[in-house]
Each structure stands twice: as C-alpha cells, then as structure tokens.
C-alpha cells in the first residue's frame, strides 16, 4: 500500500472533482483530493481482492470493467488509456478460460494478492484518469 501511495502522489492524478452528485453543482475536493484519491484507490484494490475467492468472479468483473473503460476511452479520443485497458483485457482472457474449466481441466486458480492488487490498481487508475478533466483543459 505504500507503493500505491507513492505512485498516486507521484503521478499527480487525483480525484479533484466528484461532479454533480446531489444536484447542488460540482463538488471540488481541493486540498482533500490526494487523501480522498488514496482512500478510493486502496478501497478499489481491496474490493477486487475480496471477490477473488469465487472462481472467475474477479477476472470477469475486471474484464467487463476494462473493456467498458477501453471502449469509452477510445470513443473519447484517449488512445493510451484505451490500449492499456485492451492489453489488460486480453491478458485476463486466458486466465478466465483456465479458471472456468473451458480448457478441459478441472483445476481452479485464483489471481492471488499480486494479480488482484494489480488489476484493482489498474482499474482504479483508469477510472480516475478517464473521469477527471485533463490538466490545462478545465
């Protein structure tokens, strides 16, 4: 989690604007943006880690989230984020094929802490990068 903190603060990608959640206008986080972002990223990582115990659930959820974000990024002209989502999506497919016994074997595998944490971090990172205005455009 220390590495996540360093990457979030070092990259300066933060949840600065939560949008119009309650109909009162945009909610700007100001100085609370980096702590809120850190809590949100760690929460997303732990959420994906918790669902890894069910066969194929973490991989399926990750695949759906990454394909959706990739398509939306591509449509919005964000090619780097779209390709990142596509590459991670393609890497999840063989894992799912083996995990759901499509390969013909009865073996079950889990992502483990390393896999679920990386996927949770990538999904959270893409969600933040795609939901916040780019620097200099807002």
Where in the sequence are the language-model features?
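"…together with the soluble PPM/PP2C metallo-phosphatase catalytic core" -> "…together
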Residues: 1-138
């Amino acid at each position: 989690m220390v590495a996540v903190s360093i990457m979030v603060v070092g990259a300066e990608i933060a949840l600065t604007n939560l949008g119009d959640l309650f109909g009162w206008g945009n909610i700007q986080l100001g100085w609370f943006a980096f702590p809120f972002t850190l809590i949100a990223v760690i929460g997303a990582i732990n959420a994906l880690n918790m669902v890894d115990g069910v066969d194929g659930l973490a991989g399926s959820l990750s695949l759906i989230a990454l394909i959706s974000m990739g398509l939306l990024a591509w449509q919005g002209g964000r090619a780097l984020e779209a390709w990142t989502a596509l590459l991670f999506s393609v890497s999840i497919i063989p894992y799912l094929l083996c995990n759901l016994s499509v390969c013909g074997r009865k073996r079950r595998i889990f992502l483990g802490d390393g896999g679920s944490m990386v996927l949770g971090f990538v999904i959270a990172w893409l969600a933040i990068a795609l939901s916040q205005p780019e620097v200099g455009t807002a």
